[in-house]
Amino acid sequence: MRNSPFLCSVHTHTTLCDGKDSMEDMVSAAYTAGVQYYGISSHSHTPIAQDQGLVLPQDMTAYCRVAERLQKQYEGKMEILLGLEWDSCADVSFDGFAYWIGSVHYLKCQSGAYYAVDLDAETLISCQQEAFHGDVYAMIQAYFEQIAQVAALRPPILGHMDLITKCNAGNRFFDEEEKIYQEMALQALQAVNPLQTVLEVNTGAMARGYRKTPYPALFLLKEWRARGGQIVITADAHTKEGIVYGYADAIAFAEQAGFRESVILTANGWIPCPLQE
């Protein structure tokens, strides 16, 4: 069988963090959907109070045990990789996992308060006003500086690198076509090493009705391609129905940026995959 992006889903969440379905049900749904390379990537623990119950505990033993049991159960039928979506403010290590996704979900102000950039518009307003004195571009700059810091750690996958646009429908907070914004985003992208990190084309916000196109924006994908970077199609699935949600749209979007190939993550590393069969 020829490789296809639909055979791989490596950005997924379960009830062990903020997902809606159990690890068992997510794995079963992936197998039923024809996925051959499935990655479990729950959110890493953070010290943020409002995160508790939505991220893994600091002791990830139970998480690993469930995954290992499922790996044995599906041996010979589907590869299951145990990974971690590691946040910039995590207080645990990503060492020991088959792979990890580097992400930024929070900005921290001088008072020590954390603001989620992807929760809702109200939180983003509070972040802008309280942490950045109303300066939206100072907030954006701080976000992309954190993206660059995560990129410097050489994650196998860089997650939804322009997540700060999630609540920006209709350019509510800033104009995504404006030069000042795009220069900040492109500067962060320059920190990503295309020889060591794969950029995900992530449909998660599409599944939840926040966006009509995947992360990241087309101008970022075009620049990434110009630098010789590779992409992986992901669903950022939080439900068993979302394992490969929006993949056809993500493929078409990547093709607009000039890509003809993505990669698939396997137990033996990355393998190339044509976007079209």
Where are these regions (language model features)?
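Extended substrate/RNA-proximal surfaces in nucleic-acid metabolism proteins
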Residues: 58-194
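Short Gly/Pro-enriched loop/turn and capping motifs at secondary-structure junctions
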Residues: 204-208, 238-240
